[in-house]
From Swiss-Prot:
Catalysis performed (reactions): ergothioneine(out) + ATP + H2O = ergothioneine(in) + ADP + phosphate + H(+)
SMART domains: AAA (SM00382)
EC number: 7.6.2.9
Identification of the protein by name: Ergothioneine transport ATP-binding protein EgtV
Enzyme class, broadest EC rank: translocase
Residues in the signal sequence: none
UniProt keyword terms in alphabetical order: Amino-acid transport, ATP-binding, Cell inner membrane, Cell membrane, Membrane, Nucleotide-binding, Translocase, Transport
Additional free-text comment from the UniProt record: The gastric pathogen H.pylori is unable to synthesize ergothioneine. During infection, the EgtUV ABC transporter gives H.pylori a competitive colonization avantage in the host gastric environment by allowing the uptake of this human dietary antioxidant, which is present at high levels in gastrointestinal tissues.
Protein family (similarity comment): Belongs to the ABC transporter superfamily.
Listed InterPro entries: AAA+_ATPase, ABC_SmlMolc_Importer, ABC_transporter-like_ATP-bd, ABC_transporter-like_CS, P-loop_NTPase
Gene ablation phenotype (knockout): Disruption of the gene inhibits EGT uptake. Mutant is more sensitive to bleach, the primary oxidant produced by activated neutrophils.
Gene source species: Helicobacter pylori (strain G27)
GO biological process per UniProt: amino acid transport
Residues the entry annotates as binding ATP: G37, E38, S39, G40, S41, G42, K43, S44
Length: 213
């Protein structure tokens, strides 16, 4: 299988504390990897390294066999869903959802149609489309963020505790939708979670990270 993410001999320190040392990881096309571990073990740091937001002190991180730094083309192939409300405060819900499609030059009407269809699947009423992030509940904002992260059909999707702000009903609906997207596409998923039951439901592979001593 084609390797989508390759991490080789990576070391990374944060505030003089070793988070990773000689860390290796290979993620293949179509994998759904759930990363488990206690708070502070380095789960979100791993996503930061893969996204190119953090640079290892040693070793290499490659996405699609290339380094991500300043590679706009590669970035279009990645979707990222952050923990909590990470929406652009100056854009309304619909504008947030269509942001990545706009960057790709997709027709505005087509982009909005796609966003509204996904919003309906996620239980977001059309009356919310004109609301700004500070007017949305935590669960509504999280669902808008999930749509923004998947709407452009990225080949690699990274999720950091994506269901944390949701009630049990919406959590199950969105888990089912994410599972459906994974099953019906060739996309590769990497999801950080502390919930082992959630990992068992979604993952094809799991990785437990422990804090270095």
């Amino acid at each position: 299988m084609k390797e989508i993410v390759t991490i080789e001999n990576v070391s990374f320190n944060y505030r003089n504390r070793a988070v990773f040392k000689d860390f290796n990881l290979s993620i293949e096309k179509g994998d759904f990897l759930c990363v488990l571990g206690e708070s502070g073990s380095g789960k979100s740091t791993l996503l930061g390294l893969i996204l190119g937001l953090l640079k290892p002190s040693l070793g290499s991180v490659k996405i699609f066999n290339e380094t991500l730094s300043n590679n706009a083309f590669l970035r279009q192939k990645i979707g990222y869903i952050a923990q909590g409300n990470s929406l652009f405060s100056h854009l309304n819900a619909l504008q947030n959802m269509t942001f990545c499609l706009n960057l790709q030059g997709i027709n505005k009407q087509a982009a909005q149609k796609e966003a509204k269809a996904l919003a309906l699947k996620m239980g977001l009423d059309e009356s919310l489309m004109d609301k700004f992030p500070n007017e949305l509940s935590g669960g509504q904002a999280q669902r808008v963020g999930i749509i923004r992260g998947i709407i452009h059909k990225p080949e690699l999707i990274l999720l950091d505790e994506p269901f944390s702000a949701l009630d049990s009903f919406n959590r199950k609906n969105l888990q089912d939708l994410i599972k459906e997207i994974h099953q019906n596409s060739c996309a590769t998923f990497i999801m950080v979670t502390h919930d082992e039951e959630e990992a068992q439901k979604l993952a094809t592979k799991t990785l437990e990270i422990k804090a270095l001593k």
